[in-house]
Amino acid sequence: MEKIITYIVAIIAIIALVVGSYGFVAFQGQISDLETSNTDLEASMSDIQSTLSDIQVQIGEYQENITQLEEELSGYKEITLVDDLGNVVVLTEPPERIVSLAPSNTEILFAVGAGDKVVGVTNVCDYPYNFTAWIEAGNMSSIGPYWQPAVEPIITLDPDLVFASTASEEAAETLKNLGYNVLIVEPKTINGVLESILLIGRATGNHVEAGEFVNEIRDRMDAVINTVAGATSTPKVYYEVWGPDIQSAGPGTFIDELITLAGGENIFHDAGTSFPMVSSETVIMKNPDVIIFPHMYMGTVSWGTYADIESRPGWDSITAIQNDNFHIIDASIISRSGPRLVDALETIAEIINPELFG
């Protein structure tokens, strides 16, 4: 009996030893698994840290680009500008005192938000404000005539940027030789005017406003062009620049381009010069459907009255006269290389195809 009990105890001990050994091996396996998991976790953490490091580098690069862009948008980054005559001007800071030697440039400056920096204008700059009143109040200075203005009044204003045109090219050259920054703005097409707006916007630190303004003008132009595309005919248009010695507008002029975009046919589109002198007989022969005359600065006209036009010899046979299709337009919106050319386009389109514009 004692032997049996001894055997049983021995068997139990062996079983306990086996079970204990198995548990120890299993525990060691678990420890090994934990060590492997920890290694994997450390590798993952290393990958995450590497990724975070890359992201931090990218953020640093983005911040650097943003800072550079902010500096450029603020006008503090040096910019190089090329005007319409190929002259190069380098600006290291935004201009604070601007002189405009052309009414078109004055209009653009105020349109892009740089009007508060304009300290001098010519005596024909009349938009967007009556600058005569400003000058009398001491809030603006007159630098004299548009054609070849005197340099002395400009120097007195000590401008850091002057916007000129070919009408003031001699004064512009003198100012450049004296060390002043001068940009000559002389666009020849409507797209050229839009480029001038962007140029002036960049020069003054207002290129965001200039870009938005150009987009607005393009949208208005596209609306007109799309509308007149539905016209069933192309009316012949005569525009008289000056009289009584008749001068009209030919190729290479804003007037010719505007008439075409507005859905009309300029009867002197094929003239040999931009502003041809024409005979009354030629106008009668070309028989325009629409006649447009300008009123000039301060409302003056060179052609007299409608009765004067109607009484021109032979003009009573012209279709436009017979149909009373005679119109007057503000010369400043159709001949100035400024932002109101889009106003002229809309006006001419409505004159030529009134049925399309309700």
Which residues does each predicted region cover?
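Single-pass membrane-anchoring alpha-helices
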Residues: 1-30
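Bacterial Sec-exported substrate-binding components of ABC uptake systems
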Residues: 24-25, 31-36, 40-107, 177, ...
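Extracytoplasmic substrate-binding proteins
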Residues: 78-80, 87-90, 161, 170-245, ...
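Short helix-initiation/N-cap motifs at beta->coil->alpha
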Residues: 84-86, 140-152, 271-280
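A short, structured surface patch at a secondary-structure boundary
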Residues: 97-157, 161-167, 264-267, 295
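His/Asp/Glu-enriched short active-site or ligand-binding loop at hydrolase and phosphoryl-transfer sites
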Residues: 122, 252-275, 295
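Short helices/loops that flank or line small-molecule/ion binding pockets
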Residues: 149-159, 177-178, 278-287
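A ligand-binding cleft/hinge motif common to bilobed small-molecule-binding domains
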Residues: 168-177, 290-310
